[in-house]
Amino acid sequence: SNTALTYEGCLYRLALGAGIQVHTHTNGDEATEMVLETLAPALRDVPSPNHRFTLQHCQLADAAQFRKMKELNMCVNLFANHHFYWGDEHYRLTVGPERALRMNACRTALETGVPMAIHSDAPVTPLGPFFTAWSAVNRLTASGRTQGEHEKIGVEAALYAITLGAAYTLHLDDEIGSIEVGKKA
């Protein structure tokens, strides 16, 4: 609604002006679109090239939305465990095959150049970054079916996403996320 866009737009402008990073929870493509449409004018009013506003979950974003994220210098934190725990149900019942196959589009994020982290959404699924990385690499459902072969990422990319990629989305990459002199272990 226009009220939601106005409210979100005011929040984004205030945050940009104060140098406060915002992480916005979006599941569906409509929620993602609302954020993109709201952040674009806010950034025109309050330019901030290193804002690193991040979409959390962002499960059903399509390729065009990832391109918009890139244009807006946004980050994404995708719920990689989702396929294992609910992939079969999403494929069969809730969003259908086409959307289920492109959910949590890690490869699209990487190929588009959108800085990416991946997460487990603990306590929704168990906290375990290596399982989260495994989920992004393999995209297996609980039944053993591969869901979205084209969105698989490599092991190195998955490890980056749970370490320095995650730190980057939090503006903490100068403090954590990699083993370097001066960083916290």
What are these regions (language model features)?
Residues 1-7, 58:
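Active-site gating/metal-coordination segments in enzymes
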Residues 13-22, 30-53, 57, 63, ...:
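His/Asp/Glu-enriched, well-ordered alpha-helical/loop segment
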Residues 75:
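Ligand-binding beta-strand-loop-alpha-helix segment within the catalytic cores
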